[in-house]
Design a protein with these regions (language model features):
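Conserved GNAT acetyl-CoA-binding A-motif
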Residues: 100, 107-118
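Conserved beta-strand-loop-alpha-helix junction that forms the acyl-donor binding cleft
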Residues: 113-126, 144-148
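Acetyl-CoA-dependent GNAT
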Residues: 6-10, 17-76, 106, 137-138, ...
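Hydrophobic adenine-recognition pocket in adenosine-nucleotide-binding enzymes
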Residues: 7, 84-86, 119
Length: 148
């Protein structure tokens, strides 16, 4: 059975360990100490978003994070699916689909107007999951401007 627990301060070390595994997939750099501080800030301030541990048969197998944004185009608060990670042994078992359904229900409870996300070009399994869950490709390009 798949269940979800709201992330707590006591979960930060486990979350960062999973985040390191997630980032390693695509070779993204990660500063574990900085990530721990960011998780602490995030968990303490519910206005920033929500994070959940994903459990399968009471074993933690991943996490999902929604970050909140106010958006005029969509009429209010929306969320970015900032991260959705499942351990390798949890993939392909329907847990991702259940997790998307869970965050859709949570989004309704939170009166969110829209969910959006990014997915790697090469991650066809994730793209298939998101498309089958009702997400569509957006006809705009994503750009960024990073501040140090």
């Amino acid at each position: 059975m798949t269940t979800y627990n709201a992330a707590a301060l006591s979960d930060i070390d486990m979350l960062v360990k999973m985040m390191q595994e997630f980032y390693a997939i695509d070779g993204y750099p990660i500063d574990a100490e900085k990530s721990k501080k960011l998780f602490e800030q995030f968990i303490k301030d519910e206005n920033l978003g929500k994070a959940w541990l994903i459990l399968s048969d009471e074993k933690t197998v991943g996490y999902v994070i929604l970050t909140f944004v106010f958006n005029f185009e969509y009429g209010g608060k929306i969320a970015f699916v900032d991260e959705l990670y499942l351990s390798e042994d949890a993939r392909g078992k329907g847990i991702g689909t259940k997790t998307i359904e869970f965050i859709k229900k949570e989004s309704e409870k939170l009166s969110l107007k829209l969910l959006y996300l990014e997915v790697e070009d090469h991650n066809s399994a994730a793209q298939k999951l998101y498309l089958s869950s009702g997400f569509v490709f957006h006809n705009r390009l994503t750009m960024k401007l990073k501040f140090e």
